[in-house]
A protein has these predicted regions:
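N-terminal signal peptide c-region/cleavage motif recognized by signal peptidases
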Residues: 19-21
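Contiguous segments within soluble domain cores/interaction surfaces
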Residues: 25-129, 135-137, 145-195
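Bacterial N-terminal signal peptides that target proteins for export
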Residues: 1-10
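Hydrophobic helical h-region of N-terminal Sec-dependent signal peptides
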Residues: 11-15
Length: 195
């Protein structure tokens, strides 16, 4: 019975570690091999490229290194092509990292002082893109604001992302799960030999 509990615990820790990697951050949701950005009720395919080091490889919420990044948003809804789109990247200073939401951004008094990239509002038919040179690794927050011209409505997407992400913070969970599973198997084999 104890062995079954140990195995279950090891499996749970392992699954939680994997699930944490696949969770969407903020308005961004990984869906298969693409990322879907939700701007209010509107959706867009969102991808980031690091052309200098990774060529045409696409990234969603984590960029493996600080370098030139090209952010590309392809509209799923035609109405986005008619809206004024503003794009801002800020340093994540709330301490919430991947859990930063729009309400956290609204509490920041001086957004300009932590802005690292800004694309002023303008209409971009079909595809929106912005290029930014990241100098430092760390957590950042993308803020996309879409405004209708006729109805004066505003929709916002907030998505935290990490630059210089290597996946190292999940290894302790994986190592612990493997050690726990190994211990359970060792204990099981010793018990069977003595029986």
């Amino acid at each position: 019975m104890m062995t079954k509990n140990i195995r279950s615990a090891a499996l749970l820790v392992f699954c939680l570690a994997l699930a944490q990697q696949t969770m969407g951050h903020g308005s961004m949701t990984p869906e298969g091999d693409i990322c879907i950005l939700e701007i209010g009720y509107l959706k867009a395919h969102f991808k980031t490229y690091l052309p200098g080091s990774y060529g045409h490889e696409q990234f969603c919420e984590t960029l493996p290194e600080a370098s030139e990044a090209v952010f590309v948003m392809e509209y799923e809804h035609d109405s986005l092509a008619e809206m004024m789109i503003e794009f801002r990247i800020i340093r994540e200073l709330t301490g919430k990292r991947e859990f930063t939401r729009e309400k956290d951004i609204k509490k920041i008094d001086d957004l300009e002082s932590i802005t690292v990239a800004y694309h002023p509002p303008q209409r971009e038919p079909d595809v929106f893109s912005i290029t930014h040179q990241f100098e430092d690794p760390g957590w950042y927050v993308g803020i996309i604001t879409a405004r209708t011209l006729a109805l004066d409505e505003t929709y916002v997407a907030v998505f935290p992302f990490e630059v210089g992400f290597t996946g190292y913070r999940y290894w302790p969970f994986v190592a612990f799960a493997i050690a726990l599973l190994g211990s359970a198997l060792y204990y099981d084999s010793r018990r069977e030999r003595s029986a």
